[in-house]
Amino acid sequence: METNCRKLVSACVQLGVQPAAVECLFSKDSEIKKVEFTDSPKSRKESASSKLFPRQHPGANEKDKGQQGKNEDVGAEDPSKKKRQRRQRTHFTSQQLQELEATFQRNRYPDMSTREEIAVWTNLTEARVRVWFKNRRAKWRKRERNQQAELCKNGFGPQFNGLMQPYDDMYPGYSYNNWAAKGLTSASLSTKSFPFFNSMNVNPLSSQSMFSPPNSISSMSMSSSMVPSAVTGVPGSSLNSLNNLNNLSSPSLNSAVPTPACPYAPPTPPYVYRDTCNSSLASLRLKAKQHSSFGYASVQNPASNLSACQYAVDRPV
């Protein structure tokens, strides 16, 4: 059968006839077992299918599968090649770290030549030294930021919390630009709450005692009341003027200026006003002695009933 098919195929080729199975005969001559040269529908379908899906050698399929497997292996290896290999960590010795830290304390931004010198001293590469300085600067900046944050957080004590409150929280009873309508009286101020003074246990009005002068004039009045008993020859107009000054000043000062003790310090020592008062009394006594020595103690001044201002105006120039 196979010999007959081969003879028929050779004859058809010589005559120029190309049957439907010629391609199969030329491609795989030894494997053809049955050849149909009829024009039956079955043969036509088989010829069409053979053109669309030509037969392949089973060894070729195995070769193709092997090539596909190799391509897959190459594709699997490509991402690993593209993936950046992890660099090994550099383990510094204590001597190297000591040298690097000493240089960092002197210069935080060394140039290329300095880095090369450090690399020679520490037996490292310039790239390793550059990376170490970069990481060390980042650590230093982070520590500086943390220290500044701690200072800002703990810089103000609790006694200053009252000063940090808003205006509305400190003075809830007062509206904007309404001071004239309510009036700034001592009663209105005493009823308001001041967080800063409350935290320090201080009355707001008691702060006036820290800035108000002492009752030097009242002490002057007490000392001046003793002058007539000691001085006899002094003109009466000056004594009357002192008494008038005491009568005018002492009630107003005693009613206006409170005298609570300062909570921060012991009672203050006498002011200079008392010293001047004592010096004036000493001068008055000295003048009295001079008048008594010259015999003017019995002389009466005709203008003794005048006030201090009238006496100053009527004096002859």
Swiss-Prot record:
Q: Which GO terms describe its cellular component?
A: cytoplasm; nucleoplasm; nucleus; transcription regulator complex
The UniProt induction remark is: Expression is activated by CITED2 and TFAP2A and TFAP2C.
Q: Where in the cell is it found?
A: Nucleus; Cytoplasm
Query: Which residue ranges traverse the bilayer?
Result: none
Principal localization reads nucleus
Q: Which Gene3D superfamilies match?
A: Homeodomain-like
Similarity comment: Belongs to the paired homeobox family. Bicoid subfamily.
Describe its function. May play a role in myoblast differentiation. When unphosphorylated, associates with an ELAVL1-containing complex, which stabilizes cyclin mRNA and ensuring cell proliferation. Phosphorylation by AKT2 impairs this association, leading to CCND1 mRNA destabilization and progression towards differentiation.
Instruction: State the protein's name.
Output: Pituitary homeobox 2
What lineage, starting at the top, does this entry show?
Eukaryota, Metazoa, Chordata, Craniata, Vertebrata
